[in-house]
Amino acid sequence: MNKNETNQWIASYRTDQPHFGLERMVRLLALRGNPHLKLKVIHIGGTNGKGSTIAFLKNMLGKMGLRVGVFSSPYLIHYTDQIAINEESIPEARLETLMVDYRSLLEGEHAHDLQGTTEFEIITAIAYDYFASEQVDVAIMEVGMGGLLDSTNVCQPILTGITTIGLDHVALLGDSLEAIAEQKAGIIKQGVPLVTGNIVPEALAVINQIAKAKEAPRLVYGEDYQVSHQGSVGTGEVFDYTSPLRQGRFQTGLLGLHQIENAGMAIALLDTF
């Protein structure tokens, strides 16, 4: 398949009324040897701030000499935008080869078992597949929507993060902050450390309750780590970061007070990693 054909093929699996659940993802990835279980995954959810937090974390891990896979959504121009290792997007030829492999599964003898597979499930599976085959040191997976039933949530992460909670996708996730927080907290795993960003109290209470039930150690913004704005310089923000593990002054490459919260959370994730 060429670039146009890959776009058309995967777009044909786009739907406005998906059947949510992880069963198809589990079946699909099992047919590919369960690549998602061969990775060290940092799983990031939340309403806003995911992209910036992931970018900060990716850069810091990269400076440590690690090969860092990043899966993000949505794509800007082409599906290659969603899958990258450090600064390099998946090559178009490699993506096309993987799409051919997945097409043979979805349209071949396993078609019945995989009926209802969506565009996002396919590209998520391809990301896991690519990162495993490239043997990245760590894969940062961004939740697409919600968390509990999001197709990224088949992984067994070493670390999870929830950035913020706001009213988004209310028709699917719930019409209250508490209901949405419960969906976002679906990525929390038994005993796996959780870092939370600047989350409103009513939503944080739900997340903390779920984390406690799953015995997940927590690093909470404003409690276990703090950031304080020190001023704007050029195109970035200067802030102090304080936690039991480190204290220091940092500068972001992006303007906006919310960016110091994103950067602070990325530092907390790095120190937990």
Explain the meaning of each model-derived region:
Residues 4, 22, 96, 204-208:
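Short, surface-exposed alpha-helical segments at coil->helix boundaries
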Residues 29-37, 63-155, 171, 201:
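ATP-dependent carboxylate-amine ligase catalytic core
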Residues 43, 75, 169-170, 258:
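Histidine-centered active-site/metal-ligand motif
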Residues 57, 127, 207:
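Aromatic/hydrophobic pocket-lining residues that form π-stacking "cages" and hydrophobic walls in ligand
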Residues 68, 234, 254-266:
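Short glycine/threonine-rich catalytic loop with a Thr-x-Gly-x-Asp
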Residues 111-115, 251-257:
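A short glycine/serine-rich beta->alpha loop
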